[in-house]
Amino acid sequence: LELAGNCGMSFCAPVQGAAVEQSEQRWQMYGPDIALNQPENTLHWKSFGDYLDTLDSKGSTLNIASQVGHGTIRAGVIGFDDRAPTVDEIASMETLVSESLDAGALGFSTGLFYAPGSYARTDEIVVLAGVAAKKNKLYSTHMRDESNYSISLLGSIEESIAIGRLSGVRVQISHLK
């Protein structure tokens, strides 16, 4: 099983806004035409469900599962702006997380060390992780800090635990060192 979508980046989907260029660059770099029998290196889907349908119809040599990445969703809705989302933007992100989980994403992931995930405040993640909690899905996080760059290792662990407690989601800390 190949698990994609870790650390907040699910370059496969959902793809919209600023996430389109970022995802197309990744796909061109890694050659999806070979894996998905595509005639050219372009994305032929926008939603998570469309991506999974493409895998089913084109076939894949790998058994692929994916989480839906916060960074991809945030880039698609807000771009790479270092700011809090508006009420409408957070609602759009909730919808994308929900639709992706309903379509087959195994969970919701964040990469809070990397832009654009690093621009998100804890309350934004609590709301979006709450969507995963309601669907009994996992939340995995590449924490905000693993040293002393911003909030420290212990601060990052505390933030991860708080997200779980406040949202009710199961938490997996990726790369705990």
Question: What name fits each language-model region?
Answer:
Residues 1-106:
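Divalent-metal coordination cores built from histidine and acidic residues
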Residues 49-52, 56, 84-110, 116-177:
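Histidine/acidic residue-rich metal-binding segments in metalloenzymes
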